[in-house]
Amino acid sequence: MTVLGHPRSWSCRWWPLLLLLLLTGREPGVEGVTHYKAGDPVILYVNKVGPYHNPQETYHYYQLPVCCPEKIRHKSLSLGEVLDGDRMAESLYEIRFRENVEKRVLCHMQLSSAQVEQLRQAIEELYYFEFVVDDLPIRGFVGYMEESGFLPHSHKIGLWTHLDFHLEFHGDRIIFANVSVRDVKPHSLDGLRPDEFLGLTHTYSVRWSETSVERRSDRRRGDDGGFFPRTLEIHWLSIINSMVLVFLLVGFVAVILMRVLRNDLARYNLDEETASAGSGDDFDQSDNGWKIIHTDVFRFPPYRGLLCAVLGVGAQFLALGTGIIVMALLGMFNVHRHGAINSAAILLYALTCCISGYVSSHFYRQIGGERWVWNIILTTSLFSVPFFLTWSVVNSVHWANGSTQALPATTILLLLTVWLLVGFPLTVIGGIFGKNNASPFDAPCRTKNIAREIPPQPWYKSTLVHMTVGGFLPFSAISVELYYIFATVWGREQYTLYGILFFVFAILLSVGACISIALTYFQLSGEDYRWWWRSVLSVGSTGLFIFLYSVFYYARRSNMSGTVQTVEFFGYSLLTGYVFFLMLGTISFFSSLKFIRYIYVNLKMD
């Protein structure tokens, strides 16, 4: 397919767009409602087409042999609409407010055998189209396919040449729009000879009806005329599963672990006379040995610059994820489009770069780091470089296949400008504040110059086992909800239960913190003081489980296929797992650090 011209440049709207997003979290045009008078023209924009089971594989509507104006005029698009693959253009449909149309001819066409074959292929791949009326998306299938698996075998393909538009209004505003092909017979595309032309007449009708619903948000969410699945119901199974796991883990940490610690502290804090009389310097081998390593537990780890960068970027994504969910709870995103979420995510990522710079530089200076500039460069590159490499591959595949998901050059330059003028400077500014406000690392115990030898560890205290346990338990807390999230991002579901999403997100962080504390305690009890990186890897491995789940979802829970969709799915699924590794690794590390400070502060040292 040939790529059509890109929509008019919207660079002049960039800074107003950012300001609107900053103040309201909304995209211009997504929630705006136009007021009409009877007889006013209502513009219908054609947008995109693509396989129903491949949501990210979309093409311009006019890349199909359909009714098309002589000169294609594109609608100016917002950032989120461009990122969502929208390429809206004016159409030949003539619709006027509150004026019904019984049956009007749109155009007459003579299709060659090659054009008919193009339509047949699109219909066999279940192509759907998307139009936009007053910022309301309306969708339908391009054609009809009937296939029987019994003898005699039949394979019939037909094209919908008549569309029935149904629009609901309240006063002077359009509340709902839908398209259907009920009581319409498809035009057969079978039996055409290679040198033969097919004559088609495209028609349409328009029906207006008044509704008592005053606002679009009051209309039943997810009601898309049955084209896409309805909004998901409350996921009680996910909530119960997560709550049970949280109660078990919190109970384990708060009751069992604290009871063990109380016994340890009571034994270790014997006064010197009792300890010396009972040979207190020789600990029983059955006792936990975390007290023995008090002179090594705060020994700074290797690759401290990389560790601080992980913590900084992880803290940034924790803030970004929380911000997105809070904005969704406040009703700042339209249920019909994901474009507003894309725009908000880009804006929040740029603004929260100061968090990554501050956290990374602050902790780096605390643990004695001296290469501050290198730490900032590593922090700002830790996510942006993998993201850029992944996006380059995905965008190249889209571009090679003529997909509208391929970003225009102007959009790429603008996004790069935002990162260079907003994201990177804020990282540096945050790093400066973090470095200047950092105080020396406050360790409850002094660290000896010579490191203590670590005794051999049993297999169940290995890094691999800790990563398996620490990754699987947080993953199991969100596994049910994760299906619905995948079905929304990579499928046709419409997710609006943001309250439950916030609840599950909080559960995920809580489970990660509890697991981290428990695993760190067991590691220290084995006289292994190398907890710094272990705490990050143990719970951060949840990202690996999420990626493995994405492989399972692709193979067993979806009907996605083709190079375009497959490359995008696995590319961004890998990035998603990486982001969860950064977030949960950060939560895990600071939870373990807080726990270790607590137990050693309460331990009386000689």
Swiss-Prot record:
Q: Tell me the protein family, please.
A: Belongs to the nonaspanin (TM9SF) (TC 9.A.2) family.
> What GO cellular component entries does it have?
autophagosome membrane; cytoplasmic vesicle; lysosomal membrane; membrane
Please give the residues the UniProt entry marks as glycosylated: N178, N401, N559
Protein purpose: Plays an essential role in autophagy.
Membrane topology per the entry is: Multi-pass membrane protein
Per UniProt, subcellular location reads as: Lysosome membrane; Cytoplasmic vesicle, Autophagosome membrane
Keywords of this entry: Autophagy, Cytoplasmic vesicle, Glycoprotein, Lysosome, Membrane, Signal, Transmembrane, Transmembrane helix
Q: Which gene encodes it?
A: TM9SF1
Q: Where are the transmembrane segments?
A: 237-257, 310-330, 339-359, 373-393, 412-432, 469-489, 499-519, 535-555, 570-590
Determine if Transmembrane is one of this entry's keywords.
yes
Biological process annotations from GO: autophagy; protein localization to membrane
Give a Pfam family name. Answer: EMP70
The protein here is known as Transmembrane 9 superfamily member 1
Give the residue range of the signal peptide: 1-27
Highest taxon of the lineage: Eukaryota
